[in-house]
Amino acid sequence: KTPAGYEAMYASIDRLMVFKPGFFSCTYGAGGSTQGPTLDICSEIMRRHGVPVMAHLTCVGSTVADLTAWLDQARDRGIANIMALRGDPPQGQESFTKVEGGLGYANELVGLIPSGVPDFGIGVGGYPEVHQEAPNAAVDMDNLKRKVDAGADAVVTQLFYENTDFFRFRDQCAKAGITVPIVPGLLPIVNFPQVKRITSLCKARIPSELYEKLEASKDNPESTAAIGIRHAARQAEDLLKAGVPGVHFYVLNQSEATRKVLESLGMGRG
């Protein structure tokens, strides 16, 4: 959110270009707090590198008129891909509440977005370990099916650390008649306290064996990073062998861990 922060982000992107990424995704702050700059960032990434960017859009704090105006701006800037999410409650709120004149569900947002060429490609979130607010996996899958039926072109999953969770989720999607590509999302563990906070919020689990290794190395940042990167590399290799359409890395503006994961897989060597 500062000029220095933006330049650090662009530098991270520069370092990842050797791996020929298929796209970048760009979030914005809680409650849409950086919604405007998101469009600037997406435009700048495309200008610098010519790589597609998927801009995140949520229902939080926005009316239908707000969302439609934002989509018009995105289209005018050449942004062709949208990640449509309901969004998390703003800080200080325990549960999501739609604003007057707004939308309450991601499938409604998907339905609002003009899809298909020359409009937008639409991605939606999937939850291998079930969305934290869903009462069970069946309800969560019904919600995902509604998003896909509303016009989503692909599913990008929340982070996970056990590939069997993803494979089970992928099988459940197939049984539900979901045929769009399902892209797994990985976050290499470098900052263990940070990842513990994230997984606690989204109800994702860290396998006990991995957790114990990380806990034992918590006072040694280099060891922690090595463990996390090694685990992510094994995950990515296994997923690619299993035929996923690609892997979406949650870089969080810090490219070093993802770079090491990809290098360990033999990528980026020309």
Where do the protein language model's features map onto the residues?
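Conserved N-terminal beta1-alpha1 strand-loop-helix module at the mouth
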Residues: 1-26
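Active-site/ligand-binding-proximal alpha/beta "capping" segment
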Residues: 111-156, 230-242
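Active-site pocket-lining/capping segments in soluble small-molecule metabolic enzymes
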Residues: 100-127, 177-229, 234, 264-270
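Active-site-adjacent beta->alpha loops and helix N-cap segments on the catalytic face
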Residues: 5-7, 32-44, 63-70, 89-113, ...
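Conserved beta-strand positions in the central sheet of alpha/beta enzyme cores
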Residues: 25, 83-84, 156, 248
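Conserved, mostly hydrophobic/aromatic
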Residues: 24, 74, 147, 151, ...
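Active-site beta-loop-alpha junctions enriched in small/polar residues
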Residues: 1, 27-31, 56-62, 87-88, ...
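Active-site mouth loops of central-metabolism enzymes
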Residues: 1-8, 53-65, 121-139, 215-230
